[in-house]
Structures are given as structure tokens and as C-alpha cells.
């Protein structure tokens, strides 16, 4: 009795809520064996054919590749892709891929050479002798991903399961209408599928292995039972046909009675699920040493004349496959990648086949019927009754339409498997799945932005904390440096303290002077003398910096004196010109102007003499010569004036007075220059010296007296001229 109860419990299955029973339409394609399709001329291999990031390119344009050669490197969760045939890489550029929006992905474009040569294949026939890690790494590097539609990397999934997997489920339900790829694969390759299942079981070491298959596949069921006849480690469970029993959560509940928690994974309850096609790809990767370069694709629909299942190379354009199946497009023909409920319409037919492509549906207009106009929701709750995830599609519809993301998240929109059952039963023809897909995409974008903001905030806070730590450490170092002086400063500080202590000691000691003795002030006197000497030296430096160079050139001094004389002469001439311009000029004004001219000339003469006196060593002979020359010039001017007066019977007395004043000014200027030159000489030559021209040089005092006499004579001559003229 106990054994009977255990057997009953072992074969027990559960039923999930909701679900629908649409027309299956599988008989169009499941009746013919798998066939090969002729190679296309060009293959387009998108770098990303799975969930996760794309791999790193390892080929370049112009490279010749063989079938199975890696085109990218897979690291971490990145899955590599492999060349579907031998040929030449002609381009690496973005190309439209299998996506509802026909997004462009970076792709490797290969022109086939028609030889279809493989790389060297190294199969592991004795895979049981390899470790679990080695098998997982081989599966990952050979590009195996979930072929049931999700495209999750199989190696990553196996690695994440770890040792907590108790039940391995092989999904052979294939519940969506029209699709028969897994059905035909089990019929034609049942033994290889089972071998792949055993490899997965060897890696995971589960307590039980279950194959779930719907009862609408009798040929596949019979083939599997024949292969599993002598096997007791794998159980085949036949379940009722119901859509979507092939969903991961739904099939898990049907076979085990366990429900995957909201937001969780099946591995959380000890269950891991793989697809039939994935098991077949694992077998070819491990035992045959062949990377995944092709998969089974269903070509069906009334628009194709030869429906069936084919081995389609990855990267083959959809148009090439449909043409091989006898595609006869109508005016408004559509092609759906996937099934009628979960698939999407292709915008054009040059989209390549990828790892998740399981069906290409080309229906006629009669198959799909006339498009129905979307109407308002009547809240009939039919969608809620049909939902296999126990959600409220009508509420999610309102939240999605109203952009109420928080409420949609609170109502578990993430648990929606997008099976399309709600849209199938909706009497208002509302495309609920499209609303839900868009809402989930918007929520994902918001979450990604929040993650980026959180990461940026974390980086900023970490930077601020680091700066605070560095600042605190810097202040601490400064404090330690201030409290603890350096070793080289300790000696200086000690010496200073010793000097201060010595001074304090000396200040406290009394000064004792014995009777009859004088205090010893020699140190004080020496310090005073040193300060005086320092002050004198400083004053001498200041004076030396202020005065002109000690050794000036005498020629420059003479030039400056000549310039001063020229300026005085010019001013006198201007005065004479101004005086002659006026017919009636006051003699007093003329005398005043002459006096002003004499003052200016005297000032310029003094400046010139000052510049000349800067010379330390001036030859006194030259000074005497210059004085004699000045006297001669004055005498000559007086004679010229007398001659001019005698020639002119009528001479203006004013002009004569001006000329006399000019002569006196010149004589005085020359006298001052001679006196300045003579006074600057420290050592004067003997008074009676002979100049270069042979004239006798006179003492400067005598020269001054002679100049005065000359002035008196000139004045007397001028007065006499005035009297004679009157």
C-alpha cells in the first residue's frame, strides 16, 4: 500500500490557475523530418544574441574564418559567438537584429566561401572524467545559451545553481501554437537530447530529473520513452495541453507543486530548468566539440508552400529561409518571429536568425483575420481569469496607461510573463501585452537611472570621506610636528635656552666694584665702537649709491659745458631779436632782461661746473687754457663791437647795452668754469706753467682779477660809445 501511494505521489501533477486553449496549428510543420537549408551567400552575426553584455571582438575585417571559430571572447557573463561557416569577414558594423523595434546591434558580416570547413574539433567522449568546473567552462566557451526563448547563458545558469539544486526540469512542453521545433527535435534526435540531459545531471547532481511534455506530442513521447526504457534516473511526465504550461513558473508548479516566490528564481526553491534544444546543444558542445552554430527553426504559416522544421545556421537572413520554404508574400504580408501570442512582427526580412529564433510564422490574411479596433475596457475580469501568474491585468493596464509606475510595481508587473493570454480573451481587443512591455521597459530605465544616481552618490560620498580622512591625517601630522620638534632643531632650542638661562643668571648676580678701582667697561666700549663703525659703513654705502660714478669722463663734462654755453648764447640772441623788433624799448626792461639772461646763464654754468666737478682728477693746465681762451674770446667780441660801432654812424644804444651785457655774461661764465675746474683739483701744478700753445698760464686768482678788469673796461667802453653817439 505504501509503495502504491509513493508511486501515485511520484507521478502526480498539479494545475495552475488561468490559462487558455487556443488553436494549436502544429500539424502544418511537425509532420516532416528536419532538413538542411542551402548555405546563404552572406551571414550576419550580431555580437549580442543572449541576455547580458556582448563579447569582445577577436577578428577583424579581411580575416578568413572557419566554421566554429570564435568571433568574440566570452568573459564573465559575456557569451561568445562563433562563425556559422567558413568565409571572409567583410565588415563589422551595426545591423538590424531580432528585436520588436528592429534595433541595430554591432555585427560581424561574413561572406561564405561555400566550403563550410570546420575548425579542429576536440570532443570529450569521457566527460565524466572531467570536473564540474571544466564542463561548465566548456559549455560557456562554446556559446551555449537557453534556446527556449530567454537566451540566458547556460554556463552562468549552471554555475549559479551550485549544490542547492534538487530537481532538474527539462522543458519539452512547447505550448505556443504553430511552433514545433522541440517536437521535431525530440522525434529525430531523442537519443542525443537524453545524452545532453545526462550531462546536465552529472554537473548538477540533482535528486531527480523530470521531463515535462504536453500530451499533444505523441510521436515525441514515444521516442523519449524508447530511449529511457532502461533508465531510472530520468522521469518523463506527460501533462495536459494548456497554454502557457511551458512557462518556467507554470511548469515548475505543474511538476513539483512548488511556486516560485515573487521577485525570486526557481533556484531559490531548489529547481533548475533547461530547454530540450539547450540539452541537445550541450551534448554537441561537450561530446562532439562543436560550438553552437545552428539551431532548429520552424517555418510555418499558410504563406509558405513547404512548411516544416529546418537546421538554420545562425546569421542566415530570414528571407533566405522563407525563400527555401516557398514563401509567397501577399500585399500586406507580415512575418512573425516566434509564435502568434509571444512573437513580434519583423519590419523587414534581412534580419538574421539568432540563438533565440525558434519559429518564423508567415500567416495569410485569413489566418489572422481582420484587425480589430481597440475599445475601452469594460472591466469584465476575463483577463484576470486567464492570467496564469494570478495578476490583475486590468489594473496593470490602467497603471501603465497612466504612467503610474509605483502602483504598477506594487501590483507585481514584473511577474508578467507576457504570454498574451489576457489579450487573447479581451473582448475590447486591447493589446495588453504591448502596454505591459512598454511599462516594464520604462520601469527598467527608471531603475537603471536610480542605480546610476546611487552609484554616483556613493562615489561622491566615498570621495568626501577620503578627503576628510586625508585632512584629519594632515592636521594630525601638523600637530605632531608642532609638539615634537625635529632632531636638528633640538640642539638649537637647547642652545637658546642655555643662553637665556645664562643671561638670567648674570642679571641676578650683583655688580661689585672695589674701592679705588674703575669698572671694566671695555666690552661696552668695544660694542659701541663696533656700532659706530657699522653706521659709518652704512652711510658711506648710501652716499656711494647716490652720487654719480667716481671716474667720469672729462670730455663729457666739457661737452655739457659747451651745450650750456650754446643755450645761453641762443637765449641772448633771442633777447636781442626781441629788443630790435620794438622801436621804442625801455632801457630798464632791457637791463632786467639782460639780468635774467645772466642769471639763467649762471645757473646753467653752475650745473655744468657741478657735472665737471664730479671728476676726481682734472688737469689744471686745461682749466687755465680754457680761461685764457675765454678771455681772448671776450676781448675779440669787444673789439668787434667797437668796430661795428665805428662803422655805423647811428647805433642804437639799447643794442649796445645788450651786447655789453652778453659779453659780461660770457666772461663771467668762463671765469666760473675756470674757477670750478681749478677748485676741483686736489694737487695743482705750479702757477707758472706753459700751455701747449706756448702761452703763459696764470694763477686762477689772477685770471679772475683779469676778467673783472676786462668787464670794467668793456662797461667803460660801452658807456663811452653811448656818450659819443649822443
Curated annotation (Swiss-Prot):
Binds 2 [4Fe-4S] clusters per subunit. Residues 369-397, 407-436 form the 4Fe-4S ferredoxin-type domain. Residues 537-559, 568-587, 593-699 are annotated as: Disordered. GO terms for cellular component: plasma membrane. SUPFAM superfamilies: alpha-helical ferredoxin, Nqo1 FMN-binding domain-like. It is found in: Cell inner membrane. GO terms for biological process: electron transport chain. InterPro entries: 4Fe4S_Fe-S-bd, 4Fe4S_Fe_S_CS, Ion_transpt_RnfC/RsxC, Nuo51_FMN-bd, Nuo51_FMN-bd_sf, RnfC_N, Soluble_ligand-bd. Gene3D superfamilies: 3.30.70.20, NADH-ubiquinone oxidoreductase 51kDa subunit (3.40.50.11540). Pfam families: Complex1_51K, Fer4_7, RnfC_N, SLBB. Its EC number is 7.-.-.-. [4Fe-4S] cluster 1 binds at residues 377, 380, 383, 426. Residues 658-676 have a biased composition (Low complexity). It is a peripheral membrane protein. It comes from the Bacteria. One of its GO terms (molecular function) is metal ion binding. Its cofactor is [4Fe-4S] cluster. [4Fe-4S] cluster 2 binds at residues 387, 416, 419, 422. Residues 677-692 have a biased composition (Polar residues). It is an enzyme of class 7 (translocase). Part of a membrane-bound complex that couples electron transfer with translocation of ions across the membrane. Required to maintain the reduced state of SoxR. The complex is composed of six subunits: RsxA, RsxB, RsxC, RsxD, RsxE and RsxG. Belongs to the 4Fe4S bacterial-type ferredoxin family. RnfC subfamily. This is Ion-translocating oxidoreductase complex subunit C. It comes from Escherichia fergusonii (strain ATCC 35469 / DSM 13698 / CCUG 18766 / IAM 14443 / JCM 21226 / LMG 7866 / NBRC 102419 / NCTC 12128 / CDC 0568-73). The lineage of its organism: Bacteria, Pseudomonadati, Pseudomonadota, Gammaproteobacteria, Enterobacterales. The gene is rsxC.
